[in-house]
Amino acid sequence: MTLFSSLSSLSTGSLKSSVSSIETGSSSGSFGSNETSGWGSHHWNSCHPCPPPRPICRPCPPCRPEPRCHYKY
């Protein structure tokens, strides 16, 4: 059973790294299509945090007029 537990921890670890690479990828500049996608909205959290139950939020209106929020990266 030791093999199985090490396998499962391995798969969750690789999943986390792939998720974080997606996050950094969407913050690298081209915000055109990313802006309305889940990953694009995720980066708006730096302007105004969303409520805890929703880690990825949809577009947040208060941030929109300020380009610095979206094009910071």
UniProtKB/Swiss-Prot annotation:
Residues covered by region (Disordered): 1-43
Cellular component per GO, a single term: extracellular region
Residues the record marks as carrying a glycan: N34
Keywords from the UniProt entry: Glycoprotein, Secreted, Signal
Signal peptide span: 1-21
Intracellular or extracellular location(s): Secreted
Name the UniProt record assigns to this protein: Putative uncharacterized protein DDB_G0286675
Species this protein is from: Dictyostelium discoideum
